[in-house]
Each structure stands twice: as structure tokens, then as C-alpha cells.
Amino acid sequence: PADLTLSLSQGRLAPGFDREEPEMIAALQRIVAACRTNNIRAALHCGTPDYAARATAWGFDMVTIGGDSRFLAAAAAATVAGFRKLTVSADTKGGY
């Protein structure tokens, strides 16, 4: 989606996922139609579950949601937060 945005908007729009601009949604729908015409599976990388659900409603056969680095960062942050919640009391100072 980021490369498609840059290509179609000639740099006018910043790259990113889950585009809401009518021209980008129309482009995604044209891609689905072209894939259907040529018996090709259409896939789209999405940033959120909501957008992925919309993409399947538009006819995409496969969607991905998020990416490895985001999932790992979120899991690491949740793990550290959980540890801190269990080990730090109100009167405890940091280790450094």
C-alpha cells in the first residue's frame, strides 16, 4: 500500500497503510477487479483489523494485519509493563 500510494499520487500523499482517500480506495477496488478478470488472487497488507475486514468486503482474497516488528514491539512492551506492575511499589526507586 505504501508503494502504491507513492506511485499513484506521484508523492503528493505520504506513504502509509489503510488509505482513506477516495482515489486510493478506488485504485484498490480496480486492483481487485483486474485480479478477478485474470483469475489472480488479490492480497493486501493492512494496518488494522477494521481495514482488513473492509478489504475482504471489497473482494481481497487474502489480507495481512500488522507486521512482525510491530507485533514483537507490542509484546515486549506488554511484558515489561506486566513485570513492572508486579515488582514496583509506590515507594520504590528505579535501579539506576
Residue ranges, per PLM feature:
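Expand to "…catalyze enediolate/carbanion chemistry for C-C bond making/breaking, isomerization
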Residues: P1-Y96
